[in-house]
């Protein structure tokens, strides 16, 4: 499916999917990172992936990891909670260029990593 990255002034189709700048917690409540970007279906504007900016190696190394929206298990005003642990997020493929929407092969790889393939 064709995806686009939402610009800061754009919003997903469902207001409850506005997650940018929220803290990201894993299934055990550990802070994994922050929501950096949202990727939506180009036609419907439905949220498909959340770009999680993680801090690894004592917070010195920051990486982008895409997470399928299906992995978001809860949300409150300041954070989202994933239904997976920190290791699952950090062991996923790094998203090398968060300024460009992921192609279909990369989307498939990410979905398979999280068990949604």
List the model feature ranges, each with a label.
Residues 1-117:
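Peripheral interaction segments used for macromolecular assembly
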């Amino acid at each position: 499916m064709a995806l686009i990255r939402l610009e800061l002034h754009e919003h997903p189709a469902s207001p409850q999917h506005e997650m940018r700048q929220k803290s990201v917690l894993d299934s055990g409540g550990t802070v994994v990172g922050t929501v950096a970007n949202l990727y939506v279906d180009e036609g419907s504007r439905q949220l498909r992936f959340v770009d999680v900016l993680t801090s690894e190696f004592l917070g010195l190394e920051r990486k982008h990891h895409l997470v399928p929206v299906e992995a978001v298990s809860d949300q409150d005003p300041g954070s989202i909670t994933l239904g997976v642990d920190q290791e699952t997020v950090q062991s996923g493929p790094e998203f090398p260029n968060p300024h460009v929407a992921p192609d279909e092969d990369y989307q498939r790889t990410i979905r398979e990593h999280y068990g949604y393939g």
